[in-house]
Amino acid sequence: MNNVIVDCEIEDGNIVDVSLELLTKGRSLADLLNVQLDAVIIGKELKGIEQQVYPFGVDNVYVAEDSRLYPYETLPHASIVSKLFKEIKPEIALFGATSIGRDLAPRIASALKCGLTADCTSLEIGEHEDKKKKKTYKDLLFQIRPAFG
């Protein structure tokens, strides 16, 4: 499907602020790429949780609900997200720079044999011209992150 997807973290039955911020950025990236914005929410007692993400322009919500899925545990969450991503094949996946996101995102990238950039401060869609090959690559994701030293 090549959509943009955001892994939404929950705390006390609510989507955490960092996930809402990522949904906002995800919506702008999805609009630039002319694709849909998806959200994945994993936890327990999630009835109506999708109502918290729809105001951010989410097109599809994937919910995995079970009493054993909250609080966060690495292996069950990684298994669920990996299987979902293999099925829907997102073009871009956004995870918060939280303890959960820093645990989950590299596991997903490893399982799917794909790239990962951490600690981005900005994400932009653009193009790159390879002058040697005389080829222009469009709709590239530029990941801006701080560089030290």
Language-model-derived ranges and their functions:
Residues 1-149:
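N-terminal glycine-rich FAD/FM-binding segment characteristic of electron-transfer flavoproteins
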